[in-house]
A protein has these predicted regions:
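A composition-driven surface/loop motif
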Residues: 1-164
């Protein structure tokens, strides 16, 4: 889990996600939550679950993704991503506000919600003992977040994209 101002995950080279869970919350203008640099580098996604939320100034998307949105989300709000059957893929309470977010998973049909009530979710341990990041279970209620078009749409798109 990365919570930073500036470039939260700054590879300045090719960045690859192969598995596991990655949660990134970034704040600060002129930067983005994922940054692979500008020299023909790319962000490649081939597995796991990745959520990156932050400033839209230098927002880059991985080679493929399941959900992209330019809906603003305030600090302290919870975003939850579900598969087509309503199962929670990942949930993240944002420590920083977000102007844009991307979510990568092996699912091709993903819905995002803010708020709602989670049940049966497993949370990752954190130093401050908050249930900030987790997976599994179900969600009831919540407000659906609109997906944005542009850039790559769904698994199999390009890389090092700044969609807007």
């Amino acid at each position: 889990m990365l919570f930073r101002s500036g470039n939260s995950s700054d590879g300045s080279q090719t960045m690859t996600f192969n598995g596991g869970y990655v949660f990134v919350s970034q704040t600060g203008g002129g930067n983005g939550p994922l940054d692979c640099g500008d020299s023909n580098n790319s962000i490649t996604y081939s597995g796991g679950t990745v959520i990156a939320a932050g400033s839209s100034d230098m927002f880059e998307t991985p080679s493929s993704y399941s959900f992209l949105s330019t809906t603003s989300v305030s600090a302290g709000q919870t975003i939850t991503f579900t598969d087509a059957s309503g199962n929670v893929l990942a949930t993240f309470t944002l420590p920083n506000g977000s102007a844009e977010m991307v979510m990568c998973s092996q699912e091709s049909s993903v819905t995002c919600y803010t708020g709602g009530t989670l049940s049966g979710t497993t949370y990752f341990a954190s130093q401050d003992s908050t249930n900030r990041c987790g997976y599994g279970g179900t969600i009831s209620g919540g407000t659906a977040v609109s997906a944005s078009s542009g850039g790559n749409s769904g698994p199999g798109g390009g890389g090092n994209n700044r969609p807007f």
